[in-house]
């Protein structure tokens, strides 16, 4: 990670004013966090990660807006050149995953390996600050009985982002604040307007930063993987059509298959070894159970026995009842109360007890 020479010099904070870093993307949420913490008496310093190579909203407008907010609040602004880190841990990770026929989840990976860990290290080593705050909609509490920091859903369930934070460590949570976890998005907008922030009316980003840069995930992947034609087959192996690359497909997909059929067909699995997309009827794209690896137990120690939970297998899907059956602390089997449609290898399965996020991991490819 290379530190930009444009970082400003930190002022000496009063002993009575705790120092904190605000991770600023240039959006209304992180901007409001900086203003809110300043109002609460913190000596705030803004840090923006320069992530993407080339042009894009997250690389140009975001940096400019973050700098404008810091100038408006009268706080230092530091820019950290994280482009190589982002390329290695996110871009290369995505490309490799799609080439193998899975659908990776970049946001949780980015939070752990690009944002929280490196940003906390930068704050400590370069600024002498041990606390950071972000604009994520989530909550953290300390459970004294367990001696453990716990991650909870945000008050605003429509904006809750705890799903993307499941892979954070106790060290990350111990030194992170999520001030917006107690607010709704509408209240955040109201706060931004009250503070008169230049980002108060900025539209909310709807896509991954990669999509904002490349226009679409398809364009992004085509730049790296190109076209790799192959067959679309049914579950019996009959050829129904052709595709231009398995990286254009994901399990559960129905639209854009480009094949004629008298009944609705969905992507059931992706066979990377044969360069094939396998399609079938909806029932064939459902699973009663799934294996999850790279598990991180966030709010509780890893259990030795089965656990009844509510699990999300995608960010926008509602939680459903399931049993978590540990094989080891790092690998578990999920048994769904009812078969689930479109359980996608590479995505995260994250399980909760009410608002409490217990743990999560990466969905494995099912056995053929």
Swiss-Prot record:
Catalytic activity from the UniProt record: S-sulfanyl-L-cysteinyl-[protein] + uridine(34) in tRNA + AH2 + ATP = 2-thiouridine(34) in tRNA + L-cysteinyl-[protein] + A + AMP + diphosphate + H(+)
Keyword Transmembrane: no
Cellular localisation: Cytoplasm
Molecular function GO terms recorded: ATP binding; tRNA binding; tRNA-uridine 2-sulfurtransferase activity
Site, as annotated: Interaction with tRNA: 136, 347
List of catalytic residues: 110, 209
Chain intervals for the UniProt region annotation (Interaction with tRNA): 159-161, 314-315
Official protein name in the record: tRNA-specific 2-thiouridylase MnmA
């Amino acid at each position: 990670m290379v530190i930009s020479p444009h970082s400003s010099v930190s002022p000496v904070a009063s002993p009575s004013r705790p120092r904190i870093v605000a991770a600023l993307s240039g959006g209304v949420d992180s901007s409001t966090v900086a203003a809110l913490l300043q109002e609460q008496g913190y000596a705030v310093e803004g840090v923006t990660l320069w992530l993407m190579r080339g042009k894009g909203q997250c690389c140009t407008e975001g940096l400019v807006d973050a700098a404008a907010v810091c100038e408006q609040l009268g706080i230092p602004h530091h820019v950290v050149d994280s482009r190589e880190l982002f390329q290695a841990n996110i871009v290369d990770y995505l490309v490799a995953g799609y080439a193998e026929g899975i659908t990776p989840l970049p946001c949780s990976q980015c939070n752990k390996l690009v944002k929280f860990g490196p940003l906390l290290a930068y704050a400590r080593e370069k600024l002498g600050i041990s606390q950071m705050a972000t604009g994520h909609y989530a909550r953290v509490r300390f459970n004294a009985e367990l001696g453990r920091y716990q991650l909870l859903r945000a008050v605003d369930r429509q904006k809750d982002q705890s799903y993307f934070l499941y892979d954070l460590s106790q060290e990350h949570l111990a030194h992170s604040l999520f001030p917006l976890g107690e607010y709704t998005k509408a209240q955040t907008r109201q706060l931004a307007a009250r503070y008169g922030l230049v980002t108060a009316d900025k539209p909310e980003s709807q896509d991954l930063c990669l999509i904002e840069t490349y226009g679409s995930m398809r364009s992004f992947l085509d730049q790296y993987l190109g076209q790799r034609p192959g067959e679309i087959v049914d579950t019996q192996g009959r050829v129904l059509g052709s595709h231009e690359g398995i990286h254009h497909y994901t399990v559960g997909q129905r639209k854009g298959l480009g094949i004629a059929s008298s009944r609705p067909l969905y992507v059931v699995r992706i066979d990377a070894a044969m360069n094939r997309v396998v399609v079938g009827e909806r029932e064939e794209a459902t699973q009663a159970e799934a294996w999850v690896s790279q598990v991180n137990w966030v709010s509780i120690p890893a259990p030795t026995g089965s656990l009844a939970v509510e699990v999300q297998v995608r960010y926008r899907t509602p939680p459903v009842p399931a049993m978590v059956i540990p094989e080891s602390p790092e690998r578990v089997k999920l048994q769904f109360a009812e078969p689930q449609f479109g359980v996608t290898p590479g995505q995260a399965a994250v399980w909760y007890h009410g608002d409490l996020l217990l743990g999560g991991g990466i969905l494995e490819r099912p056995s053929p």
